[in-house]
Amino acid sequence: MSILKTINLVKMYGQEPNIVKALDNVSIEINEGEFVAIIGTSGSGKSTLLNMLGGLDKPTSGETIICNKTISRLNDEEMTIFRRRNIGFVFQNYNLVPVLNVYENIVLPIELDGSKIDTNYVDSIINTLGLNDKLIF
């Protein structure tokens, strides 16, 4: 079953005569259970592609489909909700909220979503990541 798909994804930056085509009709399909590596030289469009797949940027044309939902057609509010509930994105230079402790940084997206915090689930994340000694309340 396809969990992620792009169809003729194009991303262009700039204006004539200085247009840069970062993605040029990229079509991929990733099925459930597959492991995929995106590799390429500097400037080849890897980060641009990941930004499209993560819903952080919109394509100039083409479609991005995650779990049968065409995310490239969502408005900003819909995309924010979809991304918060369905996509995990780890940035190369991640930024935690410095005034929050470890626990507060972990539960922040749950609180922003207005969802109930499952303390057992949060505890399992903390244990899995080995962050018990970093908790300061």
Predicted feature residues:
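ABC-type ATPase nucleotide-binding domains, specifically the catalytic core motifs of the NBD
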Residues: 14-16, 107-118, 128
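Conserved ABC transporter NBD signature motif
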Residues: 62-70
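Short coil-to-helix segment of the ABC ATPase nucleotide-binding domain corresponding to the Q-loop/switch region
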Residues: 100-108
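The feature captures the beta-strand-to-loop junction immediately N-terminal to the Walker
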Residues: 39-41
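ABC ATPase NBD coupling module
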Residues: 17-20, 71-88, 112
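A short, flexible loop at the N-terminus of ABC-type nucleotide-binding domains that lies
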Residues: 3-6, 12-25
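Helix-to-loop junction immediately C-terminal to a conserved catalytic motif
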Residues: 54
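Conserved ABC ATPase "signature" region
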Residues: 69-70, 117-134
